[in-house]
């Protein structure tokens, strides 16, 4: 690991010279590339330099242990203990910094919430999840925009697609993808029996046009009149848009906006995110095949989290975390769960990294 860190520091020194070179500064594209790389490794280099300074201090303090002055010797032993502790802490921090960054972590989010098994109760649960993520986004200072929705007559969602934008939105919300399960007594249940329903959450990184190129010949665009609840007409013009990506068969429908142009833009934005996610999954599937023996199949668990209303309990099955604060979680208090998932993810990645 030390060799790797030294190589990173050498590169950092080289980049520092490059970004100060007038010949390189005159080439804006090249200069920006070097500045970006310099910034990406700066935290590791500063932490490594701090680590090297602690090693020097340890060696200097060890020399004091041979002193005949008992008081000085005692102080040196105490100092050495603190330095060793600091060294171990810095090593752990450096290991975390060495974990390869997810290139999508800086992106915004397209989140799809769909009612699963459970009929109307599942649709109401999908609405609860929509509210939970909206409140979490508000706490984080992120912006939430409904891109598309399909509501039920009693206030549930068969499907809702959100655009969540703000610093750290994808890096934190990506852990929410999967099947969410609710256990509760529906308001319509006269016998008071507990029902189990599910909703699925998909978290996609929002991608720019430059990230995914869509060939105009590969898409079919249909326009139609948007409808309200129960099929009632809410618009007298053909403003709703259905985009079909012919090679993959992906269909995206948007009808929330009154303008056909806005609905078309939203539908294409969602399509780009879906195509990007598909390419990403294929890439990850190939990587997973080579690591299958070490880390399992790489497939997502069918059920990632359970929300149990009678017990006021939330359990995340991936990490075995249980909290008895159901209402707070549903009100957007998700940080404790997400922080634990991030730590678990980092631990798994460290386990599979070769730091020698």
Curated annotation (Swiss-Prot):
Record SMART domains: PCRF (SM00937)
UniProt-listed PROSITE patterns: RF_PROK_I
PTM section of the record: Methylated by PrmC. Methylation increases the termination efficiency of RF1.
InterPro entries: PCRF, Pep_chain_release_fac_I, Pep_chain_release_fac_I_sf, Prokaryotic/Mito_RF, RF-1
Modified residues annotated as N5-methylglutamine in this record: 232
GO terms under cellular component: cytoplasm
Localization (cell): Cytoplasm
A GO molecular-function descriptor: translation release factor activity, codon specific
Keywords, alphabetical: Cytoplasm, Methylation, Protein biosynthesis
Domain of life: Bacteria
Function: Peptide chain release factor 1 directs the termination of translation in response to the peptide chain termination codons UAG and UAA.
Family classification: Belongs to the prokaryotic/mitochondrial release factor family.
Name recorded for this polypeptide: Peptide chain release factor 1
The species this protein was found in: Thermoanaerobacter pseudethanolicus (strain ATCC 33223 / 39E) (Clostridium thermohydrosulfuricum)
Source taxonomy: Bacteria, Bacillati, Bacillota, Clostridia, Thermoanaerobacterales
């Amino acid at each position: 690991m030390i060799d790797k860190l030294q190589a990173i520091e050498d590169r950092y020194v080289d980049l520092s010279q490059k970004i100060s070179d007038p010949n390189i500064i005159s080439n804006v594209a090249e200069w920006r590339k070097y500045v970006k790389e310099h910034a990406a490794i700066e935290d590791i280099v500063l932490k490594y330099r701090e680590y090297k300074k602690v090693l020097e201090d340890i060696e200097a303090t060890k020399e004091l242990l041979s002193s005949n002055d008992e008081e000085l010797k005692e102080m040196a032993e105490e100092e050495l203990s603190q330095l060793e502790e600091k060294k171990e802490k810095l090593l752990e921090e450096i290991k975390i910094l060495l974990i390869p960054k997810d290139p999508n972590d800086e992106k915004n989010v397209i989140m799809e919430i769909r009612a699963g098994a459970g009929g109307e109760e599942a649709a109401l649960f999908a609405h609860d999840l929509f509210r939970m993520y909206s409140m979490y986004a508000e706490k984080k200072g992120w912006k939430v925009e409904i891109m598309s929705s399909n509501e039920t007559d009693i206030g549930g969602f068969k499907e809702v697609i959100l655009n969540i934008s703000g610093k750290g939105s994808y890096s934190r919300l990506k852990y929410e993808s999967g099947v969410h399960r609710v256990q509760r007594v529906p308001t319509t249940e006269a016998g008071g029996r507990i029902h189990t329903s599910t909703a699925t959450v998909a978290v996609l990184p929002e991608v720019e046009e430059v990230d995914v190129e869509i060939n105009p010949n590969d898409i079919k665009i249909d326009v139609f009149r948007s409808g309200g609840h129960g099929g009632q007409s809410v618009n007298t013009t053909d403003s709703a848009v259905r985009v079909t990506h012919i090679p993959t068969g992906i269909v995206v429908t948007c009808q929330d906006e009154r303008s056909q142009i806005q609905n078309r833009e939203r539908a294409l934005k969602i399509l780009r995110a879906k195509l990007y996610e598909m390419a990403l999954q294929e890439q990850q599937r190939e990587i997973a095949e080579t690591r299958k023996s070490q880390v399992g199949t790489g497939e997502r668990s069918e059920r990632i989290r359970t929300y149990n209303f009678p017990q006021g309990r939330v359990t995340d099955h991936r990490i075995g975390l249980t909290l008895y604060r159901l209402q707070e979680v549903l009100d957007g208090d998700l940080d404790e769960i997400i922080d634990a998932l991030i730590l678990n993810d980092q631990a798994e990645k460290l386990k599979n990294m070769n730091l020698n």
